[in-house]
């Protein structure tokens, strides 16, 4: 029994170590990012997916001077993101122009078609919803610290594909927005207050999170062998104790 124990315990430790090694998260490389706007709610006069330099825009509203809207410019690819560390997904732009009441969007969807190196599946489509509160530009302003002229609009977001994951080296990952930032991601906040009467940019940050690990079959087999050996040893000890009694 001592000999078997000496053989089994190393097997268990080796299996555990192997699974631990397989579970070590590595940097993830994104090789393509293509944005698409869709699903606008409320308002009128939509123009979808207009190219504007590096930005892809959605515009809305009956303008007094120019339409309002949002634009997104994804981070240049290829780029690498480390799991559980905030990274810049791209820049969000708000065209905050005076438009006729009742013609503003209340929400729009942003789809991001990405290619993830060495992932299964490699091609991913992530979806995010942006909620837009276009204020009436009348004092008192709805949000504090509003600019002059009043009043700031507020943009928030929702992740729509939190249950979607891709797998690299036996580890499942999910991608989710975590906030807006103007300081390179040192701090993030869940909303973007956009100054009235201007074009305002802000960084949009996300995070890769490790989901349920998928151990490799060989690791599971080795661990199972070790556990089976321990059970056998335990049963033999129980039988020996019974005979001695």
Q: How would you label these PLM feature ranges?
A:
Residues 231-245:
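C-terminal membrane-anchoring or membrane-association module
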Residues 26-213:
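Mature extracellular "passenger" or substrate-interacting domains of secreted, surface-exposed proteins
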Residues 4-28, 203-229:
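Short, threonine-centered small-residue motifs that mark membrane-proximal processing/anchoring sites
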